[in-house]
Amino acid sequence: MAFSGIYKLDDGKPYLNNCFPARNLLRVPEEGQGHWLVVQKGNLKKKPKGLVGAQAERRESLKATSFEFKGKKESRRENQVDLPGHILDQAFLLKHHCVRKPSDLCTINAKENDFKHFHSVIYINASENLLPLEAFHTFPALKELDLAFNGIKTIYVKYGDFKLLEFLDLSFNSLTVEAICDLGILPHLRVLLLTGNGLTSLPPNLAVAEQEASVTSLTSKRYILRFPALETLMLDDNRLSNPSCFASLAGLRRLKKLSLDENRIIRIPYLQQVQLYDESVDWNGGRGSPHKEPQFMLQSKPRMLEDSDEQLDYTVLPMKKDVDRTEVVFSSYPGFSTSETTKICSLPPIFEILPVKSLKARNQTLAPPFPELRYLSLAYNKIAKEDAVLPVALFPSLCEFVFHNNPLVAHTRGVPPLLKSFLQERLGIHLIRRKIVKPKHHVLMSRKESWKVKSEIPKVPKQPLVLHHPRMTTTKSPSKDMLEPEAELAEDLPTTKSTSVESEMPTENLEGHSPSCRTFVPLPPICSNSTVHSEETLSHLSDTTVRLSPERPSDEDSKSTESIFLTQVSELPSSVIHKDDLELKEKDQKKPPTAPREVKGTRRKLPTAFLPSKYHGYEELLTAKPDPAFIEPKGIQKNAQALQQMLKHPLLCHSSKPKLDTLQKPYVHKEKRAQRIPIPPPKKTRAQLLDDIFIRLRDPRNITEAPLGAVLHQWTERRLVNHKQYLEAKRLLKEFQARYRQLVSGSLRTVFGTTPLPMACPALSESQPKFGHFLEFMDEFCQEPTASDSQG
């Protein structure tokens, strides 16, 4: 594999997101795009002598690079290395190695010492390869390195490698526990991604390592801090289940974000710093170390110890707002009091798991676990109890705690009460029990002027639906009094409002005309929107009317009279209406013509003789007036049922605060037992299905075949199921016995001509042995038909 320096595309812009290795899977394969270019920083005349000497040294080192070919070896050319404009493509490799076919080139060897001249490479993406971490240690300015999906198992890193590396992605590899410990010597590593490495445990000395015996003296022990600048650690999608992993991570002093999603963690343990009572113990914790180092130890100190001045010393002090909590104060921060130097932690950050009763409260000489941790995520784990999460209260800087998709919150609603009252309300820790769904990006569509619709659609006016009435015809009536009973009958009969109003209009319109010439206006049909039609009919008829006579009532008088309508006129039988009309006409003809009509006041009450039979007993409803203040309730039955339900089942709102003085019932998870799926029968072939169909067609359905002995002997066991078969078999057996006796008696009668002895005689076989042999013979062949059987 070949390597190069700063990479630029044809447009002159750097593409640092995916510059190693060069890929064109997600880009359009254009001419000249996706290749590696070696760009000179400037002319050789403007470069300093040191840089020119470095390039000359590189040129000499490249001369010694060997290239193996298939069957032959050739030396490479010197004048084609530093020439600008050379592209690492197929033509360059074929011309540079003097081969005709690409299959002739087997190996390209590029030394790692060549990378030290590329001072501007800060990011390398080498994921989905088979490259080790050690292949990139010679890049002097490398800050970000992505080595995901490389199958890395072990790591070999020395002091002085990757001095400026800050971001390292080793996701989805196969790292061992020892390989993770070897990464602790990187001095400036801030972000470490270890997702999907199949880790089952973490080393106990992950944060602190004991110095080798060859370096330390026999009278003192020294410890070296690991991961001095680590702030973000991703350990999700592993197999961590032991609570000791928290003890391994608690000593990381700069850790601010820790992700342990998709593991098998059950609880968080209570942690406390280990106290070492040996006076000779010393650790390289910074300026607060009480013991001085020997001179030979300073000389042999590795690169890691040279950067100890950058490590901050902290002091554990009680908080002013809450005495139960502690805060960490760093000596390098401004405003730090020098009078508190006696409380600086002089013990190595090694933590152990202790029960709650064994913790030493308010011990200011001990450092708290995770002193700077602000974000902790334990989603998709197996935490089922609230007590298993309470130890996060000992983390002094924790601000956000994520625990969604755990059994603790999977089967309940809301934040658990103990965590809400103690962690959220008292300590101010933000609890996240639900997965935060990221909002989707809004898609912005480009607006073109040609797409804009400029035409306006006129609004359709809202007009009521008008029904066309039949045309009016003029007819001659014999007298004026013949139409008055019709109007009175239309007012008295129970009809709709529109019908009652329209029935009065013909009588008003006919005033002023002679009795011999009047216009007849038929009533319009009854419809749902009767009010609209009545108003239109009134306006239509007002054009053809004349003045009202003083004898007729005015419009105000007609409106003042109100009526109650029980049903429509169309529901009455035509024979009843016709009969009532004739009776009313005869009654009006007998009245004197000078008698005035009384319209005002209460409406006339019809006699019971003129009402249909189904209205008998309801005459008072025709003259009663509704109460104007009465409001008819809607859905009174449902309201009554709802009121009864509320009275029987009152809603009691309990307090959301937990009752700490009472015993709480622990949550017991009920496992769902899935029913066993029955094993499906073997699939039959087409020939077997056809055979089954032919058998069903051939066998009669009214005959059931069963062995006689099985039915008779198994009746006691399957009495309820085969009781009918048992009775049928018993009847057939009796019939067979009777038939057998008839056969024997008939055969004996034809042979001897005399009446045989009864079958129950015990001395029959002894006195007449020939009859006994004959009976045995008949027992064997009783099923064969005989002539006597057919005659009988």
From Swiss-Prot:
Known tissue expression: Expressed predominantly in testis followed by prostate and ovary. Low levels found in other tissues including peripheral blood leukocytes, spleen, thymus, small intestine and colon. Also expressed in neuroblastoma, glioma, breast, lung, leukemia, renal, ovarian, prostate and colorectal cancer cell lines.
Coiled coil: 723-745
Compositionally biased tracts (Basic and acidic residues): 549-560
Gene Ontology BP terms: response to X-ray
InterPro entries: Leu-rich_rpt, Leu-rich_rpt_typical-subtyp, LRR_dom_sf
Disordered: annotated span: 490-517, 537-562, 577-601
Cited PANTHER family: X-RAY RADIATION RESISTANCE ASSOCIATED PROTEIN 1 XRRA1, X-RAY RADIATION RESISTANCE-ASSOCIATED PROTEIN 1
Protein name, entry field: X-ray radiation resistance-associated protein 1
Gene Ontology annotations for the cellular component aspect, listed alphabetically: cytoplasm; nuclear body; nucleoplasm; nucleus
Keywords assigned: Coiled coil, Cytoplasm, Leucine-rich repeat, Nucleus, Repeat
